Amino acid sequence: MAKNRFNQHWLHDHINDPYVKMAQREGYRARAAYKLKEIDEQDKLIRPGQVIVDLGATPGSWSQYARNKLAQGKKRDTQREGGIDGTIIALDLLPMEPIADVHFIQGDFREDDVLRQLEDVLEGRAVDLVISDMAPNLSGVASADAARIEHLCDLALEFAQNHLKPDGALLVKCFHGSGYSQIVEKFKQQFKVVAPRKPKASRDKSSETFILGRQLKQPR
């Protein structure tokens, strides 16, 4: 019974959520697009000509937002009509419906085959921005969940270290609670500038937050 009440409350909140309504109206696949939008507007992350990698991209709202932003900056005299000024590569273990001008690779980005596909698209270029909305399946056991969250952040940090330009940026989702300070410390070890971000589109009751790192301390 309690679970049913929880589901009813969640459904009511979801249906009446202004960001859900806005996403439906503007064609985004999830309200998460507005989290990236707010952070981007504050920190000017996405700019014309960039190479962007979206980790854990499915269902695709972050890639949609990045695609729309790069389409706005398109140089019409040099880019084909309908294209974008830049490159977006989305990766996920799960399938994702196609998005115009977005390269999607399904698989684990730690595996050689997936990395080869990524390198084929990059064509030797370094990455300007890595964005990660990855989140684990939470168990409700604080210590186990903290370890899973930290593991995903570690994967994003390692990917960024291997692929980012020296002045590139990494934005990841994490959660306040056990293990959060350790994640922040890892960011500080890797980046010159580190800042937490809590966009308004994150639900008030959620411990969800984002960490932004800029400028690698030891670029490869």
From Swiss-Prot:
Keyword GTP-binding attached: no
Enzyme's top EC category: transferase
Active-site feature positions: 173
Keywords in alphabetical order: Cytoplasm, Methyltransferase, rRNA processing, S-adenosyl-L-methionine, Transferase
Residues reported to bind S-adenosyl-L-methionine: 60, 62, 92, 108, 133
Region annotation Disordered: where it falls in the sequence: 197-220
Location relative to the cell: Cytoplasm
Coiled coil: none
E.C. number: 2.1.1.166
Catalytic activity: uridine(2552) in 23S rRNA + S-adenosyl-L-methionine = 2'-O-methyluridine(2552) in 23S rRNA + S-adenosyl-L-homocysteine + H(+)
Biological role: Specifically methylates the uridine in position 2552 of 23S rRNA at the 2'-O position of the ribose in the fully assembled 50S ribosomal subunit.
PANTHER family to which the protein is assigned, alphabetical: RIBOSOMAL RNA METHYLTRANSFERASE, RRNA METHYLTRANSFERASE 2, MITOCHONDRIAL
Family of this protein: Belongs to the class I-like SAM-binding methyltransferase superfamily. RNA methyltransferase RlmE family.
HAMAP family, per database record: RNA_methyltr_E (MF_01547)
Protein name: Ribosomal RNA large subunit methyltransferase E
Gene this chain is encoded by: rlmE
